């Protein structure tokens, strides 16, 4: 029997329409909606934003991430969010660039990055994309359609205060062995 203190948790849902979520001109509004909804929740042990609530790569939004991480740190909160992640170190070692659908933990006593292992066909990757590239050449240049990579099966759990969190993104919860492994 493990004994750890309970966590006070806030789940934030911005209800951003899918047809607007990834539009460049709507990204600032999306971030404002989530930041506004979170404002009164700082001070909770854990604040959770949903999958891809930040609709841009971490490399393109460093000032926003730094501000959110600082707010979490200042209030003693851990902040967990969904964000597409461009792994620059991996991309320098191999081609093509490595993009992931991820969950990132940061803030007070929080750390970790989980890279989704079970990708949605035709949503996060195109099956047989090498064979289809001559039919759909635009797919090769669109990371939101064909560029997501699978995360490794042996990832370290996210850490939030004294807790280790098993992660699952989207339909990964339909794979009980994966979910169980991620939680151990």
Predicted regions and their residues:
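Enzyme catalytic cores with a strong preference for nitrogen-chemistry domains
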Residues: 1-184
